[in-house]
From Swiss-Prot:
This is ATP-dependent protease subunit HslV. A double ring-shaped homohexamer of HslV is capped on each side by a ring-shaped HslU homohexamer. The assembly of the HslU/HslV complex is dependent on binding of ATP. It comes from Staphylococcus carnosus (strain TM300). The keyword Hydrolase applies. It is found in: Cytoplasm. It catalyses: ATP-dependent cleavage of peptide bonds with broad specificity. Coiled coil: none annotated. Na(+) binds at residues 164, 167, 170. Its EC number is 3.4.25.2. NCBIfam families: ATP_dep_HslV, PRK05456.1.
Length: 179
């Protein structure tokens, strides 16, 4: 049995001048045990102007949150620059390369996925999801964005709710943060 602690779903959207990020609360040990149902995987950074959410190993994600916040401070809140610098450090550092997590970071102007392979990806349609239920949340979010007048916050919540109904590694203890 794989005893790493992981699995989650994070969804982010920008719409009509608003930005929202949602994450579920489940932490799973391996593939059989729910360790925690109320984890907070979406955080406000840089005086509340940036949202960050993680999927993957909890301990690794805390390391990345800390490093990303340091980069935000270093580059005066420039999200893109901080994300690129984090990705370069993550990919280039032997110890950091071992970290098993992905991040979504966003402000009111941008959404980015940052990975340990050095990638920084900006979605074409102002919404993105990562984690075990990411594809389910992304599908729901795209449909809701195209065919409803829901707010960014409501789409984020509903997308996570759909993912929680399909993915066993995602629960419906959903936290939504909005900018």
């Amino acid at each position: 049995m794989n005893n790493s602690i992981h699995a989650t779903t994070i969804f982010a959207i920008r719409q009509n001048g608003h930005a929202a990020m949602a994450g579920d609360g489940q932490v799973t040990l391996g593939e059989q045990v729910i360790m925690k149902q109320t984890a907070r995987k979406v955080r406000r950074l840089y005086d509340g102007k940036v949202l960050a959410g993680f999927a993957g190993s909890v301990a690794d994600a805390f390391t990345l949150f800390e490093k990303f916040e340091t980069k935000l401070q270093e580059f005066s809140g420039n999200l893109e620059r901080a994300a690129v610098e984090l990705a370069q450090e993550w990919r280039g550092d032997k110890q950091l390369r071992q970290l098993e997590a992905m991040l979504i970071v966003m402000d009111k102007n941008s959404i980015l996925v940052v990975s340990g392979t050095g990638e920084v990806i900006s979605p074409d349609d102002d919404l993105i999801a990562i984690g075990s239920g990411g594809n389910y949340a992304l599908s729901a979010g795209r449909a809701l964005k195209r065919h409803t007048e829901m707010s960014a916050k409501d789409i984020a919540y509903a997308s996570l709710k759909v993912a929680s109904e399909i993915c066993v590694f995602t629960n419906d203890n959903i936290i939504v943060e909005e900018l």
